[in-house]
């Protein structure tokens, strides 16, 4: 049985309104005010600081070999602390090599976002390069099959670009610790992630926020699914492809994916508003649509999360009883572990603090 407990969560308190969209003005950092709300989630797994530090060390050495080892990049890795996130989200994994492969994928995906998307979000509204660049990034893990001369040209382009090379090499490590079916699963999920990135960029170019239902539909794609879907590979087993593809299992995976991504929205709410002209997170979207203050929208976002996680509890129970299989039980437990670790990491990481 899954134990859902209430986690007291600080609510950002809105300061005097300064933005063009209600609910997107400056706010005090979460934790400053006295108001809290409750998020329901399993309790966090134990910390493994020594393992996390070793994963981070290996990832930094790898980055330096790619030409991504500048002082700011290395500092960013230690602030992001992917090793801690992986050990929290995959408490069943004891294999540092497997967890390091996941750490490299996280850093590579973050590099794509930072280099191709976050930078562009600060450029002029006529910049249309994100879509083509994301397609290029996907080809680094899903190689084109070209004529020999063109293939050589593409290979050189990929290897000369540190972000594309990071994608390619990180995915190569992932292929070594997973089955072909597991690797293809993640390859597909990353393409879906880039579709979500591109949609978000479209809203930014329009300088508008989507309605809540459309935002959440996009968040289903612009999500942590590529990371969450490594749960069996990192634990050293494989959920059979036909079982993974079963509608009941896909339903559980999709629900867990959206919930995990909302932790990012909630924990990074204040930072996003501070750093971006147009914040793109669930509280901001709710505030704009319902014309309410950010703190009220934050509480409403937590209520949506709680509805979703209770529905996931029912869905995983139904899948486990309808498809009785030891590997599936292990996989569903892994989804819940990922949520517990992700919630804890997001609300305690230095990445989301000022």
UniProtKB/Swiss-Prot annotation:
Protein EC: 4.2.3.118
Q: Which reaction does it catalyse?
A: (E)-2-methylgeranyl diphosphate + H2O = 2-methylisoborneol + diphosphate
EC class of the enzyme, as a word:
lyase
| Cofactor(s) needed by this chain | Mg(2+)
The SS bond pairs are none
Q: Where is this region: Disordered?
A: 1-29
Question: Which InterPro entries does its entry note?
Answer: Isoprenoid_synthase_dom_sf, MIB_synthase, Terpene_cyclase-like_2
Q: Could you confirm whether the keyword Lyase appears in this record? A: yes
GO biological process entries: terpene metabolic process
The answer to whether the entry has keyword Cytoplasm is no
For this protein, the record's Pfam families field holds: Terpene_syn_C_2
Q: Name one GO molecular function term.
A: metal ion binding
The role this protein plays is: Catalyzes the cyclization of 2-methylgeranyl diphosphate (2-MeGPP) to 2-methylisoborneol (2-MIB), which likely involves the intermediacy of 2-methyllinalyl diphosphate.
What is noted besides the main data? 2-MIB is a volatile organic compound that has an unusually low odor threshold. Together with geosmin, methylisoborneol is responsible for the characteristic smell of moist soil as well as unpleasant taste and odor episodes associated with public water supplies and contamination of various foodstuffs, including fish, wine, and beer.
Sequence similarity: Belongs to the terpene synthase family. 2-methylisoborneol synthase subfamily.
- This protein is called 2-methylisoborneol synthase
Q: Whose protein is this, by species?
A: Saccharopolyspora erythraea (strain ATCC 11635 / DSM 40517 / JCM 4748 / NBRC 13426 / NCIMB 8594 / NRRL 2338)
